[in-house]
Amino acid sequence: MERIPYLGHTILKWQVGTSTFLALPEKGARLMNWNVTLGDGTVRDIVYWPEVKALDDFHKIRGGNPILFPFCGRTFDRSDIHFWSGEDGIRRPMPMHGYARQGDFRTTRLDEGGFSAQFIPSEEAKAAYPYDYEFIVSYRFEKTGFHVELELNNRGTVPIPWSAGHHFYFTLPWTTGLKRKDYILEVPATKTLKHMDSGRLIEGPRLSQRETLDNPALIDTIHTGLRGHTFSVTERGSGQQLKFNTGFTNTTARDAAVVTWTSDDKAPYYCVEPWMGPPNSPENKAGLHHVGPGQTQKFLVEITLN
């Protein structure tokens, strides 16, 4: 593990075999970049990070893996966006994707294999999500991929609702000259959903379990009703594949979701996002998990390059 100065901050670098990982644990527990050195000496970016001049709006940078906690996507309370209501019926604010991605973290583990970091809630986050908890993000880096674990420990006396997730930005295309049509997404979903501006989830669009990434219907689509915990993106011709495995500890995977998104057809990235459930989970209840007093739940994601 190596410390590197970067735009007035110190980021961390791990070299594991031919893989290099860059992260800034204290800012959103953010994995910034994953790249691989190929046999000919060239470097291929897998997790995308853009060229930026400053880190002032770190959470707004489209790159790396922003952590989404306590809830993914937009939340609503009776059609009003950026609010939510808990079991007590009190309306509270909740920004898109929650508070962790723009939050501060304290590093609790730092070694040659990765890091763990604990969320330090701001006063705003404490008021909006008023529970006694520990939220910990842990990465373990390997030669051909990594594991990331989201852990919520309930230190209080009431159940804590959550539905966290990841917002991975992947470099696309992987190979010069290829297009999005050359990449195949395979997700074992039995249902697709769209999130409406009212907060409701509606069914559609109609998609197969095997789609190329140039299909515009994939953008902002929630894939759920998963028949398995494995999905992938494969490059035609070379057969190179990013394989995802997800898992849960002490809770059900019934409403687990994969969200696909990109900003436009010219963006140098494509987001494939494992979520614990669909957006607006406090209101729609789909994918909403509860951690009992004294209990712990985990959401696990493994990504490997084959």
Predicted features along the sequence, with ranges:
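Surface-exposed acidic/polar loop and edge beta-strand patches at domain peripheries
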Residues: 1-147, 155-161, 168-306
